[in-house]
Amino acid sequence: MAFDSAAEGYERARPDYPVELFDDLIRHTGVGSGDRVLEIGCGSGKATRPLADRGLRVTCVELGPRLVARARAALAEYPDVEVVHSSFEAWRPPDAVTFDLVVAATSWHWIDPGVRYRKTFDLLRPGGHLASWSAAHVFPHGGDPIFRELQDVYDEIGEGLPPDAACPRPGELPDLRGEIEATGLFDVVSVDQYDWEVVYDAEGYIRLLDTFSGHIAMAPWQRERLYAEIRRRLGERPDGLLRRGWGAVLHIARRRGA
């Protein structure tokens, strides 16, 4: 599992999700202190902590053993958080427990499409909610040109983008509304996009890239060439910084049926 090899860097390098996202999640789902939450693929616990801070009881299911260890250490102060080492597909709750909310933060797309909606439906109480979102790169008008400028390096090392690659603007990320409705298992409650910016120096940005599956899979020489060029180009800037736009689409859906 590629992400597991980057367990330590994941917590440090990946961006925190906006506070507004969690506020809206609570408002739209109505969950409150003491309610049961299942988090699919918690990683290092980026989304877990804000949920636990709001008094929710969270069971986290994580496939990567290093990420499990990292999450357990990071979340040790929360007695109502449990981190289980398992794939979501294989995991079974104890004693037929059901949940008020199932959360998938930058993990939903990794779950078997033939399993994820049906199993989530089965794990939720009637009227319970599914909340899923992913953090993605967005490209604002007038944004940092370095991402376009670095494409020649990606091309050189054989990792260039196809000509029709999407470069979404803030507010333009695709959503899963149609996919959710097509299951017949859930009613869409809300779909909201959140956009924010993170400023990186060269080493911080390289740490971020080291958590992406495509960069993890590169040959060492490819990473060395790319990272050397990032250091060189940012070193030529007066402040030595780049600005990366992030976006996330929060989907909230209510379980149908009694």
Residue ranges and their predicted role:
Residues 1-35:
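Conserved class I S-adenosyl-L-methionine
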Residues 36, 44-91:
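Class I SAM-dependent methyltransferase SAM/SAH-binding core
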Residues 40:
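Conserved beta-strand/loop positions that form the S-adenosyl-L-methionine
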Residues 44, 168-258:
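Conserved Class I S-adenosyl-L-methionine
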Residues 92-102:
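A short acidic, Gly/Pro-enriched loop at the edge of an enzyme's catalytic core
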Residues 106:
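Short catalytic micro-motifs in class I SAM-dependent methyltransferases
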Residues 111-120:
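A short, conserved alpha-helix within the catalytic core of class I
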Residues 121-195:
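Conserved catalytic/acceptor-binding region of the Class I
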